[in-house]
Amino acid sequence: MEETRPRLDRNTARQLIERLNLDAERLVRRFGLRYRSITAERAGVRSRYGVCYADGAIKIRLRHATTGRALKYSSLVNTLCHELAHLRHFNHGPRFKAFYFEILDHARALGIYRPGGSPAAAPLRAAHAPQRRSARPAAEQLSLFG
C-alpha cells in the first residue's frame, strides 16, 4: 500500500522548519557547533536534499523532488545531521562520515531521529531509549555520499 503524505502548505513548512531548529539546538549544544540559520530549500531545487554554506546557513528540502509531497521527518533529520556535520568538516571524507554518524546516533538517542517512522506532520513524541546501531550504516545514510 502506498503511503500518502500531504503536499506541504506554507504553515506546515514553517512548523517543520521550527521543529528542525529546535532539534538542531539540542544537537549543536552537544557537539559545540554553531549555525546561522535553517531554512527551507526552494521547491524547485531537485539536485540535493540539503546544503550547508560556509557562513553556517543551512537549507533543507522539505518536499519530494517529483511529487511535492512532504518528506518523512526522519529523512529531514537525517539531512539535518548531515548538514550539521559539514559545520566541522566541509567534505565527505572519513572524519566527516564518522562525525555525521556520531550526530545521527545522538539524534537517535534523544528520540529526534526515528528511521522508518512517522511522516513529516506527525506529532512530536517524548524521547525513548536509543535503538541499537547496527555494524553497517543503513542504505539511506550511505546514499547521501553518492
Predicted regions and their residues:
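Walker B catalytic acidic pair
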Residues: E83
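Active-site-proximal or metal-binding-adjacent scaffold patches in catalytic folds
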Residues: M1-N78, L87-G146
